[in-house]
From Swiss-Prot:
SUPFAM superfamilies recorded: 5' to 3' exonuclease, C-terminal subdomain, PIN domain-like
One Pfam family of this chain: 5_3_exonuc_N
CDD domains listed in its UniProt record: H3TH_53EXO, PIN_53EXO
Cofactor names: Mg(2+); K(+)
Annotated binding of K(+), by residue: 176, 185, 187, 190
Protein's job: Has flap endonuclease activity. During DNA replication, flap endonucleases cleave the 5'-overhanging flap structure that is generated by displacement synthesis when DNA polymerase encounters the 5'-end of a downstream Okazaki fragment.
Any one Gene Ontology BP term: DNA replication, Okazaki fragment processing
Keyword Magnesium: yes
Top-level class of the enzyme under EC nomenclature: hydrolase
Protein name: Flap endonuclease Xni
Signal peptide: none
UniProt keyword list: DNA-binding, Endonuclease, Hydrolase, Magnesium, Metal-binding, Nuclease, Potassium
Organism: Vibrio campbellii (strain ATCC BAA-1116)
């Protein structure tokens, strides 16, 4: 039997649904709305296996903040009513047949990346449901990303139009430009246009840095800020080697569970 694993970036979905609710304390409405959303996802995707991956709301900013102290320093905290409602949300999702994986020390992004690439590398189909373009570096013939809210696929044509580079170059791209929303600085003076020019000529940051053909205006910037570029690339790259502690059989989709 062919496999189709759907991985839901849980808080990415929940926080968007919750922020659109007229009453932020009405978690019951958030549960109902996310439930309808999940029903549509299940209907459209027809998964054989499915899991929702959550960041732990109490954890720190993980290993990335250890090497880049400002990483996500300014991110908005989760609303208190939503924090208190997470257990109820996870229970409601479980009743729909979707189990939850809660990160402990690792960012949810890395857990998603590890599971997705592990399954996709065996030629099985994987769909990540998220608006987070960071996952696009994982794109492969068997791994796709679905932006549910914009009703679009974050695929190679989208990446080409949005960034002008290949999916495999995205970590290098962000190493150069930085990621302002996560307080990742990149290389001062290198914006999207410059990063695209560099990565059109060279495969990655190291190839550009090592080449005598790099144009002088970019040579000066990389000479002065190569360590920042390397560090920011490392932060932008997703880890795909985390010990998950479960196997596919544990997340087979068999339909709704009985309420406990």
């Amino acid at each position: 039997m062919s496999i189709h694993l759907v991985i839901i970036d849980a808080l990415n979905l929940i926080r968007r649904v919750h922020s659109a609710q007229p009453d932020p304390t009405d978690i019951a409405r958030t549960i109902t709305t996310t439930g309808r959303t999940l029903t549509r996802i299940l209907s459209e995707a027809q998964p054989t296996h499915i899991i929702a991956v959550f960041d732990h709301h109490e954890q720190d900013r993980g290993w990335r903040a250890e090497i880049l102290p400002d990483y996500k320093q300014n991110r908005k905290p989760m609303p208190e009513p939503l924090i208190k409602g997470l257990d109820a949300l996870q229970q409601a999702w479980w009743e729909q047949g979707i189990d939850s994986l809660l990160s402990e020390g690792d960012e949810a992004d890395d857990l998603v990346a590890t599971l997705a690439t592990k399954v996709a590398s065996h030629g099985e189909k994987v769909t990540i449901v998220s608006t987070d373009k960071g996952y696009c570096q994982l794109l492969s013939p068997t791994l796709q990303i679905r932006d549910y809210f914009q009703h679009r696929w974050l695929d190679e044509p989208f990446i080409e139009k949005e960034f002008g580079v290949k999916p495999s170059q995205l970590a290098d791209y962000w190493g150069l430009t930085g990621i302002s929303s996560s307080q990742v600085p990149g290389v001062p003076g290198v914006g999207p246009k410059a990063a695209k020019e560099i990565l059109t000529q060279f495969e990655d940051i190291e190839a550009a840095y090592a080449s005598e053909e790099l144009v002088p205006k970019y040579r000066k910037k990389l000479d002065e800020h190569i360590e920042s570029a390397r560090l920011c690339k490392r932060v932008a790259a997703l880890k795909c080697d985390i010990d998950l502690g479960f196997n596919l059989q544990d997340i087979r989709f068999t339909g709704p569970n009985k309420a406990q």
